[in-house]
Amino acid sequence: MPDTTGGHPAALKVVTLDGPAGVGKTTLARRVADALGIPYLDTGAMFRTMAWRLGPDGPDLDEALLRDRLAGFVFTLRGRGGASVLSCNGEDIGNEIRTEEVGAMASRIAALPVVRECLKAAQQRMGAAQPLVVEGRDMGTVVFPGARHKFFLDAAPEIRAMRRYTQLQTMGEAHDLALLTEQIRSRDEQDRNRAVAPLRPAADAIIVDTGDLDIDGVFGVIMQHIRSRDGL
């Protein structure tokens, strides 16, 4: 497998957007990919897909059995910009993975080194093959530390919970806002304090507080930094 963890040229063509749940990573990553004309990779969807397919008992599987199960997942990416489509074993990934239940399971399996090792290899293969806009929680720190453009998006838990609440309403799901806020705080705690690849900004990442900006404002900040550095 090509080394994309350091100075590999392919890593320089990657734009990373990291941050906790609810900061707008998905929407922004799609827009940036559209603007740059390159594929977009939602790594959170990869974790959610694994969690959904492994089921509630996935995190408790014996490591050897889990490793064997993980070897059966093959992710592929096609298309460009926001229209990029991620597939697993030939099946396009849909909204079935976007529930709060699957999100909670994904956070659990994301703490397992064997899972992160498997997905890191898959993500690096994609980044070695083509330029990418990639979103996640450790893209700029662990998966693509040599990426040319790194951004870390953040906002207060209350703001992120409201955004998630609105998003779920549009999907026809009813949720309690106070409970969503508590779930986001709990997931933040878990993601920031896990032993493997904790959620944190890369030392050279541009940190953007999305709480006081709308999507257009954050998009403008990101594109300004990219164009300035690349002389566009």
Swiss-Prot record:
Q: Which reaction does it catalyse?
A: CMP + ATP = CDP + ADP; dCMP + ATP = dCDP + ADP
Under which EC number(s) is this enzyme classified? 2.7.4.25
Primary site of residence: cytoplasm
Q: Which residues bind ATP?
A: G19, P20, A21, G22, V23, G24, K25, T26, T27
**Mind telling me what this protein is named?**
Cytidylate kinase
Q: Which GO terms describe its cellular component?
A: cytosol
Write down the species: Nitratidesulfovibrio vulgaris (strain ATCC 29579 / DSM 644 / CCUG 34227 / NCIMB 8303 / VKM B-1760 / Hildenborough)
Give one GO term, molecular function aspect. dCMP kinase activity
InterPro entries linked: Cytidylate_kin, Cytidylate_kinase_dom, P-loop_NTPase
**Gene name as annotated:** cmk
Q: Which UniProt keywords apply?
A: ATP-binding, Cytoplasm, Kinase, Nucleotide-binding, Transferase
NCBIfam families assigned to the protein according to its UniProt record, in alphabetical order:
cmk
Broad enzyme group: transferase
- Record's family? Belongs to the cytidylate kinase family. Type 1 subfamily.
Annotated GO biological processes are: nucleobase-containing small molecule interconversion; pyrimidine nucleotide metabolic process
Highest taxon of the source?
Bacteria
Pfam families per UniProt: Cytidylate_kin
